[in-house]
Amino acid sequence: MRTCLLDPVQGYYATANTPPGTFDALTETRDVLGARGDFITSPEVSQVFGELLAIFFVARWQNTARDAPLRLVELGPGKGTLLADMLRTFARFAPFYRSIKDIHLVETSPGLMELQYNAIEKALEGTGKRLVSADQEVVGEDEIRVEWFPLVDSVPIRSDSWTMVAAHEFFDALPTHIFERSNDGFKEVLVDVERGGQSGITVLKPGDLTSSSKPAVGGPPKFRYVTSPGPTPWSLLLAMRNKRFNSLQPGQRVEISPEAWAAARRIGELVSGRKAAEVAPEVEEESAKTARLQREAERVQTPSQGGAGLIIDYGDEKAFGGSFRAFRSHKIVDPLEDPGKADLTANVDFWHLKSALFTTDARPLRLMYQAHFLQALGLGPRVEALEKAAANDERRADISSAAKRLVDPTGMGAQYKVLGVSSEASSGGSAEAVAKAKEPADKVYPFEMDEGSGGASAEKQA
C-alpha cells in the first residue's frame, strides 16, 4: 500500500493533480478527488460539512482556551476544500480568527500541495489575514504561517498553542497488514508475482546480471495473494500478542495497521501538547527506572494549552478481515490490477485508534455516526439558511440534495464515523494531578450528551 500510494514518482498520491511532464513521459497524472476522480469525500459534497467541523472547534476553544494562540493541523487535506470551508467559517468569529497563527498540513503530493495553498489563499481573501513563510519567526495578527510535513510524526508537539487536528479520510489509506489464523498461529497474507506454476525461487550464478527467467509475454507481470509458510515478525508482534484476536478460527483473517496506531498516538500528543509517557520495560535497572521517572515528572509538569481533534473515516469500533479494496472512477476494482493507478483503502478499526489515544494525555470521546454528529451541530438550520439565500430553485435543490447525501442512513451518514479527541488546558503538576485533569471538566458536545442517541460504538471485539 505504501509503495502504490506514496512512491515519489509512480505513487497514486504523488502523481495526483500534477501537471503533465512533472516526472517523466511514462508517468500518468490524474484527478483523484471529485466527479472526475476516483472517489468523492464529504467536503466535496457540501460546504456545510466543513462549516460544522469549524463550529465544533470554535465551541471547544471558547470552553477551554480563549486566550491561547491557535494552530490548525490537517492530515491528508486533499484539494484543501475542507480546510478552506473551515477557514471561511473561522473568519466569522473575530477573536478566534485573530488567534490563528499556524496551519500545519501533512501531505506528500506536490500537485495537491499547490491546490491546498491556492485554496487557503482564496479563503483568506477579504478576511484581513494573509499567508507568510514558515521561516518567519514572528507572526503578526494579520498573518498565518503555513507549513507542509511528509509524516504526521514530523508535525511538532506544541504546548503553547491550542491545537486543532482534523483527520478526514486519512486513516483508511494507511498501510495495513493482513493476517490469517492457522492451526499453529497467524500467517501473513503477502503479495507475490504470478509465476505460472514456476518456483518462487530464482537462483543467480556469480556474474549474472539478469534473472534467467523470462518475463511473461504480453505485458508486465501479474500479482497474486499468498500466505507466508509460517509466522512472520509482524504476525508475531501484531496478531499473536493481541488478545482481541484469540477467538479467531483457522482461515479467518484480520487487518491491522501499526501506522494507524502510531498516527493516532501522535494525534493524542498534538492535541494534549505533550509527548506520551514512556512505556516501562519488563526488566529495568534501578538507575534506568529512576531516570525514567524523573523524565516523567518533568513531562507532566509542562504546562499545556491542550486542544481538540476530529477523526472522520469509514469503519467501526472493531477489527475487519476483508475490507482491503481499491477504487478507480468511483468503482471497486482489483487492488492488484495496475498498481499506483487506484486508491487503496481499508476500513478503520476505531478501537485500535482509541487504544493508541489512551496512551497519551488526550482522551478519545464516543464514536458517532456522521449523520448524528452533523445534525447535532446544526445541519438542519444551516441548510435552511443556505436554501433561503439561494439564487434559484435549481441551486436550492442542489443544496438540499447534498445535505441529504451527508446524512443518508444507507450511505455517508452511517458509513462514516466521527471520533472526537479532547484535552483540557493544564498548568502542569504531579502525575496524580495530570491524571485527574484527564477526567472531563465539562461534557464535550455532541459526544458526551446524556441522550444516548447518535453513538456508533460496537462491541469491543475482533
Give the ranges of each region predicted by the language model.
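A short, conserved alpha-helix within the catalytic core of class I
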Residues: 151-158, 171-187, 253-266
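Short capping/connector residues at structural and topological boundaries
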Residues: 10, 17-18, 38, 44-45, ...
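Rossmann-like AdoMet
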Residues: 1-75, 79-163, 179, 351, ...
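Conserved protein kinase catalytic core
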Residues: 113, 174-175, 319
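Long, Lys/Arg- and hydrophobic-enriched amphipathic alpha-helices
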Residues: 233-462
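Short, well-ordered beta-to-alpha junction loops that form the rim of enzyme active sites
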Residues: 77, 168-170, 312-315
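A mobile, often basic/glycine-rich helix-loop segment
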Residues: 164-239, 325-335
